[in-house]
Amino acid sequence: MEDTRAEALPIGAAEAAAALQTLQRYKAGKAALDKRLIDNELWFRMGHWKNYRDPLMPDKAQPSSGWLFNSIANKHADAMDNYPEPMVLPRAADDQATAQALSSVLPVVLEQADYEQVYSDVWWRKLKQGTGVTGIFWDPAARGGLGDIAVRSVNLLMLYWEPGVQDIQDSPDLFHLSLEDTARLTAQYPQLAGHAAGVVDVPWYIHEDGQTTANKSVVVDWYYKRPDENGKLRLHYCKLCNGVVLYASQNDPALAARGLYDHGKYPFVFDPLFVEEDSPAGFGYIDVMKDCQNAIDRMNHAMDENVLLASRQRYVLSDTAGVNEEELADLSRDIVHVVGRLNEDSFRPLQTAGLQGNSLSYRNSRIEELKEISGNRDLTQGGTTGGVTAASAIAALQEAGSKLSRDMLKSAYRAFARQCYLIIELMRQFYDEQRVFRITGQRGESEFVPFSAQGLRAKPMPAVGGVELGSREPVFDIVVSAAKKSTFSRLSQNETAKECYKLGFFDPANADAALAALEMMDFEGVEKVRARVRQNGTLAQQLVQLQGQMARLSAALAQQPGGTQAAQDAAGLTAQLPVAAAARAMNWNGKEVK
C-alpha cells in the first residue's frame, strides 16, 4: 500500500531519475567552468606548480611569488572597507512607516544571520572564481522553531543550471549539491536505508590534507519552476540522495499549490565580476593575471638557480686528472691530494655567468604589467612616486586610482539590493508572529521595535464609485550605501562638515545663501544638511518676527506711567532671544535648551 501511495505522489522515483538525467546534462555543459574553478583555487593558494610539475625532477624547487595573491587581498580589503547598508524607500505615501521600520530592522536581520562573514566569503569567491553567489533561505528550525532568514555563501562549483542562460532565473531547473554524512542522513530519513550507493559524483578542489568521501553521500537540492493551473510559475523544491526522494514540496499538501517561496525566484543571487555572454557566471582577476604571474614565477625560478650556481664553486675535472674528488668536494679540508701533475686541460673552474641587468629589468616590467592589468598600482596601496608628499595630493591620487574598486562595489551593491528584496519577500511570507528587534536610535540609544508581516502584506483599496479595486501589496525601493567606510572617506566627510561650519552655513542669518550653495553641492548626507539649514532659516525668520513684536511691546510699555524699567527688561530679553534660539537649534550638549 505504501508503494502505491508513493507512486501516486507527484514526485516519485521516475521524476527523480529524470531530474538526475537533467543534472548530468547540466554538468556536461559546465565541465569547462568547473575545471577553471579548480585551477584558480590552486593559483590563489600559490600551488599552481602542481599543474606544471616535471616528472623527471619531482624534488626540484619551484618558487611562487605572491603578486597575484597580494592584488586579490587588496581588492578584498577594499570590499570590506565598504560594507553595505540598506535604506528602504516606499513607493506610496501609505507605506512610509513600514519603510522606516524596514530600514531599521533589515540591518539587524543581516547581523543575526552573520552577514558580514557571508559578505567576506562571497567576495573571496568573487575575486577567485569570478562569481560570488549568495543564498537567501528560510530556516524553519531557527530561533527555537520560530524560523528565521538564513544567508549563506554558496560554492559555485556545486551549482548547476541550464547551459546558455544569461540570468539564473531563466533556467527551468537549478541544482545545488552538497556532501553529508551517510549515517546521519539515514537516521533523519529512514527511506534512505539500503540506498548507500552513490549515483552522482561531484568535482573536488585539490587539497593537501587528503580528504575522503568514504562515508559521505551527495545530497541534491533540486529547485525547479513549473506553471500552476493559472499559468503562474511556482518555485518547487525536492531533496534527493542516491536516487531517493527525501522531501518534495509538491508532495507536501501545504506547499503543493503554493510552491516553496511566494516570490517564485531561485534563492540564489549571482554577482559576476567580469560578465561572460550566455552565462550567469563570470571570470575573475586570476583568469586575467595568471599568465603574467606564471611568467614571473618562471623567471624567478631561473634567476634563483642562477644565483645559487654562481655562489658555488664548480670544476671541470678530467678522469685522468688524479684529483681526490671527495676531498675536493669537502670544503672543510685544507689539503686536497692529487696524483700526478695538474694542468688546465684536465682541471679548471667552471664559471657561471651572473644575472644580466636586462633580465632584471624585464622581470620588473612583467611585475609592473601585472599591477597594471589588475589595477593594483602602488598608489592604491598608499605608495607614491615622483616626489608626491602632500597628504591631499596622495589622497587625490588614491581616489583617482580606485575607479576599478568603485566599479566592483557598484556591482556588489546591486547584488546586495537583490538580496534585500528576497529577504523582504521572505518576511512578507513567514513573519506571521510579531518579533522584537533591538535597533540603534538617532541619538545612539538602544530602542526595541516590534515588527511583523502585517505591514508588508496586501491591503484592501478603498472603493471608488461603489467599485471594489481589490488590494495593493506594498512595494519598496532599496538604496545601498557604505556602512563601514574607509579612513579616507571618513576624513573627507569630516573635512566637508568643517568647511561648511567655517563658511557660516549653519548661521541662521546665512540660510538663503547657504541653501543656494548646497543646491550646487553633492556629497553623502547633503539632504540632511539642507534640512538643517532650512530649519535654521525658519528659526531666523521667527526670531525677526518675535524681535519686532518685542520692540513694539517695549515702545508701548515706555509710554505707560512707570513703564521705563519694564521696557528696559523687555529690551534685554529681546537681545537674549537669538542666543537661546540658536542654542536650541544646534541642541548643544545633546540637551534641550529652555
Q: What would you call each of these model-derived segments?
A:
Residues 1-257, 320, 354-358, 362-365, ...:
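Extended, helix-rich architectural segments
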Residues 84-89, 117-125, 136-140, 306-319, ...:
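Short coil/turn segments at secondary-structure boundaries
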Residues 96, 100, 117, 283-286, ...:
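Conserved structured core elements
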Residues 105-112, 292-310, 331-338, 353, ...:
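Generic, well-ordered alpha-helical scaffold segments in large soluble proteins
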Residues 140, 392-511:
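Extended amphipathic alpha-helical segments with heptad-repeat/coiled-coil character used for oligomerization
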Residues 221-387:
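Extended, charged amphipathic alpha-helical segments
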Residues 512-552:
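Long, highly charged low-complexity segments enriched in Glu/Asp and Lys/Arg with interspersed Ser/Thr
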Residues 555-594:
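Helical coiled-coil/dimerization "stalks"
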